[in-house]
Every structure is written in structure tokens, then in C-alpha cells.
Amino acid sequence: MSRTVIIGSRDSQLALVQTHWVRDELQRAHPDIRFEIVEMKTQGDKILDVALAKIGDKGLFTKELESAMLEKRTDLAVHSLKDLPTALPPGLILGAITEREDPSDAVIVRRGLEAAGLADLPEGAVVGTSSLRRLAQLKHHYGERLRFQDIRGNLNTRLRKLDEGRYDAIVLAVAGMRRLGWSERISEVLSPDISLHAVGQGALGIECREADGEILDLLTVLNHPPTARRCRAERAMLRALEGGCQVPIGVYTELDDSGRLTLQGIVASLDGRNMARACRSGPGDAPEALGRAVAEDLKAAGAQAILDQIFVLVRSPGVIAPGAAPAS
């Protein structure tokens, strides 16, 4: 194929690091093709004074990138897979899922504060997070001791707010910190016992036009089958629950050497008091079926009632989450 391939990317530092990595991998595999990056801002990048859950749009960080592909201004887009809705616009497809970085959540403690992690923070310490999933699980474990506030902005902005003393700690994805070369700032990596990660967290999703066979062929070099199986199970579970990126749904997956896939899922109330849990194992070559089965188990365990209550709460004026307030 003799032409230039245009890659769409958000314009944040992390997004560009990820997109440049994808571009370089594609260039290495296809040296006869030219790959160019086009940067753009999404709605989620522009609205910084409202909690993500209050905006209530499942395509906050993807719609502009998708429009560019549908209008044939770009050929593909690079997403943090956790930001990509499970229902894609007609005509678009998830063409590749890259090898996953550590999907865990990370705690970054403010410099000068002697604490190895959340358990060591003084009573009343303020922890920043923009994720209802993290908030609900952390309130379950630390709600009696710690205070939680919303925090918005890219990773650079959040770390600056932390260092300015507006928070005592913040919770981010390990993957983002590592990709930006900031691993030394991580104070604690949260275990699945404390915080199940977001669907797709740690992996990149490469989206393209479904009918563009040439681009789909190019993307095969980026696809990592073990990661893809895990993430497709997670996304199938999320899709069956009709949840978006901004609801307290957490997952944890394992794929053993025999190809058997295990999926653990959780749906939590905003105050962390009620949790529906489910776990199943199945053949790794049927990840979507496993995801749907775990979703049904979660519904049987009370997940639907929890989600229904959350959808009412986050749409109510002035309500973000119990115990959480916008960071000033």
C-alpha cells in the first residue's frame, strides 16, 4: 500500500506518548508507508470544571476522534482502551488491542508527607480521584479515615495539584505513570483485594473503519492475543451491564498457560457499602461468552439495583458522590 496513513490522537502528553509508540511500531513493521499523527481535543479534554460522572457521556474522550475517521480525515485512532465505549459507532471497529501494561491503580502521595500508601495517611487526609470506581472501592476500605475529592485534568495537571498541597494523595493508573516515565512517583500499587481495575485499563485500543481492510491488515502487528482475550471478556461484561466508563464497575482477569480465562467483576454503590461480586472461569477462546455470564451473575447478586440508583444520583443536580466534592 503506497500512501500516507493518518493517525488520530488526543493532544495530552500521555495520549501522544501512546500514539507515538503506535506510530513507531507501525513504521517499523511497514517501512514503505508513511504514518502521520493528527492531534485533537475531545469533549473530556475541554470540560474540566465538572466531574466526569456528571457529564454522563460514554464517548467523552473518543467522539471527535471517531468523527474524523468516519469523515475520512484520519484512518485510525489510538485510545486508552478504558476510555473507549463498548458500543462503537456504525462503521467503526476495534482493530487491535495492544499488549497490556500493569492494569493496577497507583497511589501517589504528596512529597514531604511520610506515608507509604493509603493505610499510612493521617486521619482526615484528602485523596483525589476522578473515578467513581476507585472512589467506591476506596470508601469501602478507607471511608472511615480518609476524605475523597474529585480531581480533573491530565496527569501533569493532577500531579501539579498534588504537589501544590491541594491533596495528600491521588490515585491514578500505573500504566499512565509508567508510560510517562514517572514510576518513581508511585508510592503504592493497589492490589485487587483493594481496588479492581477498570475495563481495558493498561491496554491501548486501535480503532479504525470496519470496511478498511488495508488498515485492518496493517494493525495485526499491534494486536496481542492474550491481552485481547482478557479485554474482550471485560468489555463484554461491561456491555451486558450497560455501564459506561464512569460507573463503579471493576474487573480483574487472568489467563493461565492452558488458555483458561478467569474474570472477576464487581459493581459497587457510591458509598462503598454495597458490592455485588462475581467470578467465573472459561475457555480463553470464548471471552465474550464469559463476560456475559459474569454480568448475569452480577445482576443476580444485586448489581442492577446498585446501577439504577447510581444513574439517578449522578444525574441529580449538585450530586457527585457521597463524601466527594469538587477540588477547589
From Swiss-Prot:
Keyword Disulfide bond carried by entry: no
Record text on cofactor binding: Binds 1 dipyrromethane group covalently.
Entry GO CC: cytoplasm
InterPro entries according to UniProt: HemC, Porphobilin_deaminase_cofac_BS, Porphobilin_deaminase_N, Porphobilinogen_deaminase_C, Porphobilinogen_deaminase_C_sf
UniProt GO BP: chlorophyll biosynthetic process; heme biosynthetic process; protoporphyrinogen IX biosynthetic process
A Pfam short name: Porphobil_deam
Top enzyme class: transferase
Coiled coil stretches, renumbered: none
Key words of the record: Chlorophyll biosynthesis, Porphyrin biosynthesis, Transferase
GO terms of molecular function: hydroxymethylbilane synthase activity
Pathway assigned to this chain's UniProt record: Porphyrin-containing compound metabolism; protoporphyrin-IX biosynthesis; coproporphyrinogen-III from 5-aminolevulinate: step 2/4; Porphyrin-containing compound metabolism; chlorophyll biosynthesis
NCBIfam families linked: hemC (TIGR00212)
PANTHER family assigned to the protein according to its UniProt record, in alphabetical order: PORPHOBILINOGEN DEAMINASE (PTHR11557:SF0)
Listed HAMAP family: Porphobil_deam
Note: The porphobilinogen subunits are added to the dipyrromethane group.
Subunit comment: Monomer.
Family listed: Belongs to the HMBS family.
Function statement: Tetrapolymerization of the monopyrrole PBG into the hydroxymethylbilane pre-uroporphyrinogen in several discrete steps.
Name of the protein in question: Porphobilinogen deaminase
Lineage: Bacteria, Bacillati, Cyanobacteriota, Cyanophyceae, Gloeobacterales
Gene: hemC
